[in-house]
Amino acid sequence: MGRTLYDKIFDEHVVHTEEDGTAVLYIDRHLVHEVTSPQAFEGLREAGRKVWRVSSIVATADHNTPTTGWERGYDGIADPISKEQIVTLDKNIQESGAAAFFPFLSKRQGIVHVIGPENGATLPGMTVVCGDSHTSTHGAFGALAHGIGTSEVEHVMATQTLLAKKAKNMLVQVNGKVAPGITAKDIVLAIIGKIGTAGGTGYTIEFAGEAIRDLSMEGRMTVCNMAIEAGARAGLVAVDDKTINYVKGRPLAPTGVEWDQAVAYWKTLHSDADAKFDAVVELNAAEIVPQVTWGTSPEMVLGIDAVVPDPDKEKDPSKRGAIERALTYMGLQPGKPMDDIFVDKVFIGSCTNSRIEDMREAAAVVKKLGQKVAKNIKLAMVVPGSGLVKEQAEREGLDAIFKAAGFEWREPGCSMCLAMNADRLEPGERCASTSNRNFEGRQGAGGRTHLVSPAMAAAAAIHGHFVDIRQFA
């Protein structure tokens, strides 16, 4: 019987299997940042161990890095704990070594899930881990990638392996072509809206179908990034020419004979025609409209042409209660049109949507509308995902488009995706955000988050409320 893409990668990395089915899995790439690594390095020191395979580590600072005040250097990091974590990462990597390290203030520094792929650290067929739940991003390359906890970070550093039980296989097939103006973010939000945030629990999801194949590598990264929000630990897309062309020539990619050998292997990284999946979900791409979350979970999402749901119409008591709690927190009334929801702040960035194509997508909307940020918008900020993205955007003049319209153009970092740095919402503030989580307090205590695509966020900044981006496509 044929094997799925997940089966192939998992099986080829099994070092040993216990009687209960637990596998010792070899890890090819370990991505490290400043938040989940300090305890791991300290644990190694206390045990008298060293990093087993230094060449597997690629490190950067991202969660705590400020997006302003870089001219002040490390003194620009206002929070002492944030500063300590960033300084500690510098010291730990200097002591242990790494295949590549992109420290705070360096040209290639950025969000770990942006700098990994752009530097060729993420390759097809790899097992990739990081102490961050959105490591699933790297599955876009046909790599088995998922987040791990701090104790597991130390385990991988010490042994280059991880204990894992094999997941079930789910195929999410998005058939046909999307309408103009529909993006990867809309696709993945529609998927989550269909299967729910627990739909992928216990599975690894392979994303397939014409609409997925049509996506660029950056679009595929957006989809795989949010596989975790569908309950899956990992998401995958089969390798094709787009994958190989993206990787070619990047700093950490193989070269010469090794490149040729790698490509030959990479071309086998797809599910066999007769592979069996434990679950199959299908979506019609033509039916996907611009998506906006209304509640406090990514599954609480609707099309821009819908209205806020009425809990009284929900028969399931637990679901009805969840809707009521979400509406109370979000300050929304049932029946309110989604395009009548006004926002206070706009955030374009995060490991979901901060790559150069996201910048172009948002800038194109701003340029087409030709107007300033709406007066009710307190802050509209654009945060590129890495120094290289920022540099490329500035070469293309995208920063000038944003700044002329009244957006703030920031330095790279995780920024307002999470309330771990200076960029955050105040209680009661409503944000159109291109990030991946709209949980209570995610962007700041009492903050209200609506997840959207970069184009939808840009349009909301100009209009002051959500609008149907298809009219500008």
Curated annotation (Swiss-Prot):
Its required cofactor(s), as named, are: [4Fe-4S] cluster
Q: Might you give the EC number(s) for this enzyme?
A: 4.2.1.33
* One Pfam entry name: Aconitase
InterPro entries on file: 3-IsopropMal_deHydase_lsu, Acnase/IPM_dHydase_lsu_aba_1/3, Acoase/IPM_deHydtase_lsu_aba, Aconitase_4Fe-4S_BS, Aconitase_4Fe-4S_dom, IPM_dehydratase_rel_enz, IPMI_cat
Q: Which top EC class is named for this enzyme in its record?
A: lyase
Q: How is the cofactor bound?
A: Binds 1 [4Fe-4S] cluster per subunit.
Q: Look up keyword Calcium and say if it applies.
A: no
Q: Does the keyword Iron apply?
A: yes
Q: Which reaction(s) does its UniProt entry say it catalyses?
A: (2R,3S)-3-isopropylmalate = (2S)-2-isopropylmalate
Pathway(s) served = Amino-acid biosynthesis; L-leucine biosynthesis; L-leucine from 3-methyl-2-oxobutanoate: step 2/4
Cross-referenced CDD domains: IPMI
**Biological process terms in GO annotation:** L-leucine biosynthetic process
Q: What residue range is the signal peptide?
A: none
Give the molecular function GO annotations. 3-isopropylmalate dehydratase activity; 4 iron, 4 sulfur cluster binding; metal ion binding
- Tell me the keywords, alphabetical order: 4Fe-4S, Amino-acid biosynthesis, Branched-chain amino acid biosynthesis, Iron, Iron-sulfur, Leucine biosynthesis, Lyase, Metal-binding
- Specify which residues bind [4Fe-4S] cluster according to the UniProt entry for this protein: 351, 414, 417
Q: Main role? A: Catalyzes the isomerization between 2-isopropylmalate and 3-isopropylmalate, via the formation of 2-isopropylmaleate.
Subunit comment: Heterodimer of LeuC and LeuD.
Give the protein family: Belongs to the aconitase/IPM isomerase family. LeuC type 1 subfamily.
Protein name (record): 3-isopropylmalate dehydratase large subunit
- What does the organism's lineage look like at the top? Bacteria, Pseudomonadati, Pseudomonadota, Betaproteobacteria, Burkholderiales
